[in-house]
Each structure stands twice: as structure tokens, then as C-alpha cells.
Curated annotation (Swiss-Prot):
Main location: membrane
SUPFAM superfamilies in the cross-refs: ENTH/VHS domain, GAT-like domain
Listed GO biological process terms: clathrin coat assembly; clathrin-dependent endocytosis
Protein name per its UniProtKB record: Putative clathrin assembly protein At1g33340
Length: 374
């Protein structure tokens, strides 16, 4: 009972602080009334009660910043100040969730301006008091959530509605080979960094902000589904071009494959855990394909052999890899044939005519013609 009274007292005190913050906003001499409305809306969205971020308030913030020039730096300042001043887990978590929803639900222009504000240091989310505390598992989740958002702000939603890492200088690629190389050596490492932060944000044992954690984790999972599809495409492209790379590039590629093997295994475990939560069962989980370390070892061995001989992936090497995969599949039923490492078994028919210098040449030709007529 004492704990309940203490929690109730802290909540009442927090609500009083919220009203005081709104009162201070009223006496501020803002050039634009919209700035006052934005500050009040941020306080309401991140109040000390245990209610989730209100959709109505969220839409109000989006409307205000969309129709008020120069409001994004002001909004970034309000978010940074809210995180720096609060000592309440709920307020900190709701402020981070507000920032996350702004990244997810705003226009592309607002998203880009938030990215610029974070890059310039105007928007600071990593200097909060809970970043130095290890007293509670809730603090640990908030720390991991901050790390995730710092990685997430480096991604942007493209015109197709998919997440992609921000490209410096607006780099464009005109040829398919250039696009494939970019996918492997720029986007794939970014995917691995993104997934690494996702894996740290496990919602297990995150009391006392369970509802907030589940809301945040739901958004994280939805974004991880998109990034995983890009991740899978990148690994497929990496395996396809592995034997065409230089030796240093192949060594780098094999290192990425080893890291991917462990990450995807951990990602499957995380998805299985999250399916057990009521609010996350209905999410559209992707089919995560397992990557066996045995397959990576086989690729590394063939890569080393190919590097010594100085040739690309030949039919003999491809057949060797395929045979190795077939043997591994007999010992491991859990490995899916749709994995990026599954290479098709190819049978190639020689189209070279062979001329026999014997007396039965004409008869052989007739037999050949009959065989083709069939």
C-alpha cells in the first residue's frame, strides 16, 4: 500500500508540473501563436499519466509544424528540453515515443528536417539522466531505445514507403552493377547496424512501463520487418557476386555473412518472443530464413580456392557448393531451401557438335536426327 501511495503521489506531483509548464508557455512572448500551441501539445503528449501518446495530440503537432515555417527547430528544442529535465520514466519514454512517431508519421520534409536537427546537435536525445543509470530494467530499455532512435534517424522513408539509409550527397547509380555493389557494401552494413539496435530492444521484463514498452516495440518491429527484407536482398546479392570480388573484398564479405548468420538467428528468437505479447500477435512478421554457419564455411573455402586459381564462380565450383549444401540439408532439416545461400542445381547440355572419323558416321548422323525428331 505504501508503494501504491508513493506512486500515486508522484503522479499527482507530475501532473502539477505539467500544468506549471503549460502556464510558463502562456507567459512566453512567442512571435507565433503556433509556437505556444506546439509547446503545450508536447507537454500534453508526454504528460505524467500512464496513458499512451494521444493520437489527437499527435495529429495536432503534425498539423502545427506542417503549417508553421521554422517550427521544426523549435519542436526539436522542446523534445530535447523535455528529456533533459524529466526524472520520470514514463515522461522520458513517451517523449522518445513521440519523436519516433514523428519520424514514422510525418511528411518527408519534416522527417528530413528532424534528421538535420539531430545531425547538427540541435535535437539531443542521448543526454538524459537515465542514460547513466542501471537501477532498473526500465532504464536499460530506455537506453536501448535511445540507441535505436539514434540509428533510426539516419534512415528515411522513401517515396515507395520503404525505409532506406540516408545517402550522403544524393549518390545515384546508373548501372545495375553499381547498384548491386552499393546494396552490398553500403546498405548491407547499415542494415546490420540497424538490426543490432533492434535486437537490444527486447520488451521482456521491462516493468513498470509495460504498455509504453509494447507501444515502442511495436513500432520498432514494424520497421525491422522492412529493413530485414532489404537485408535479405543484400545477402542474396552478396553471395551472387562473392566470387567476382577481389580477395580483400571477399574477406570483408565473408565477415558480413558470419555476422548475418548470428544476427538472423537472434532476430528469429526476438520475433518468437514478441509473438507472445497480446499487442504484437497480429503484426505481419516476415519469414526469417536461417543461415547455417556450415554454408558460410563452405563459401569461404570455395572463395579461398577460387582466389588461388584466379577465376570466377565456375560450373565446377557451383556444383561443389551445391553438393555441399545438399549434404548439409540432409543433416539439418531446419534449413530452408529458400535461403539466400541455396544455389540451384544446374544441368548444362553441351551444344558442341562432335564429329566421329569412322565408317559409321552417316549412320550416327541418322540416329542423331531421329533423336532430335523425337
Amino acid at each position: 500500500m505504501r508503494l501504491d501511495l508513493s506512486a500515486k503521489f508522484r503522479q499527482v506531483l507530475g501532473l502539477a508540473k505539467d500544468h506549471a509548464s503549460i502556464g510558463r508557455a502562456i507567459v512566453q512572448n512567442y512571435n507565433e501563436k503556433a509556437f505556444f500551441d506546439i509547446e503545450v501539445a508536447v507537454v500534453r503528449a508526454t504528460s505524467h499519466d500512464d496513458c499512451p501518446v494521444d493520437d489527437k495530440t499527435m495529429h495536432e503537432i503534425l498539423f502545427l509544424v506542417s503549417n508553421t515555417p521554422g517550427s521544426i527547430p523549435f519542436l526539436a528544442e522542446q523534445i530535447s528540453r523535455r528529456l533533459a529535465k524529466t526524472r520520470d520514466c514514463l515522461v522520458a519514454g513517451k517523449t522518445l515515443l513521440l519523436f519516433h512517431r514523428l519520424l514514422r508519421g510525418s511528411s518527408r520534409s519534416i522527417e528530413q528536417q528532424l534528421h538535420i536537427a539531430h545531425t547538427s546537435g540541435h535535437l539531443q536525445i542521448g543526454c538524459s539522466w537515465f542514460m547513466m543509470s542501471l537501477d532498473s530494467r526500465s532504464f536499460v530499455f530506455l537506453q536501448n531505445y535511445v540507441a535505436y532512435l539514434q540509428e533510426r534517424v539516419g534512415w528515411i522513408i522513401n517515396q515507395a514507403g520503404k525505409l532506406e539509409p540516408v545517402m550522403s550527397g544524393g549518390t545515384k547509380f546508373s548501372r545495375y552493377k553499381e547498384k548491386s555493389m552499393d546494396l552490398v557494401f553500403h546498405i548491407l552494413p547499415k542494415c546490420q547496424e540497424f538490426i543490432a539496435q533492434v535486437l537490444k530492444c527486447s520488451p521482456v521484463d521491462a516493468w513498470p512501463i509495460d504498455n509504453l514498452v509494447q507501444a515502442a516495440t511495436g513500432n520498432i518491429l514494424k520497421e525491422s520487418f522492412q529493413v530485414y527484407m532489404t537485408y535479405s536482398d543484400g545477402m542474396t546479392a552478396l553471395v551472387s557476386m562473392l566470387f567476382d570480388l577481389s580477395r580483400p573484398a571477399r574477406d570483408l564479405a565473408c565477415g558480413m555473412l558470419r555476422k548475418a548468420s548470428q544476427q538472423i538467428q537472434d532476430l528469429r528468437i526476438l520475433y518468437d518472443k514478441c509473438r507472445g505479447f497480446a499487442g504484437m500477435k497480429s503484426l505481419d512478421y516476415p519469414s526469417v530464413q536461417a543461415i547455417s554457419m556450415d554454408h558460410i564455411v563452405a563459401l569461404e573455402e570455395c572463395s579461398s580456392y577460387g582466389g588461388k586459381r584466379g577465376f570466377s564462380l565456375s560450373t565446377n565450383l557451383r556444383d561443389a557448393i551445391t553438393c555441399n549444401e545438399l549434404k548439409q540439408e540432409q543433416h539439418s532439416a531446419s534449413f530452408s531451401s529458400t535461403s539466400p545461400f541455396s544455389l540451384p542445381v544446374e544441368t548444362k547440355i553441351s551444344m558442341v557438335w562432335v564429329v566421329f572419323d569412322n565408317e559409321d558416321g552417316e549412320e550416327s548422323d541418322k540416329q542423331t536426327e531421329k533423336a532430335y525428331e523425337r
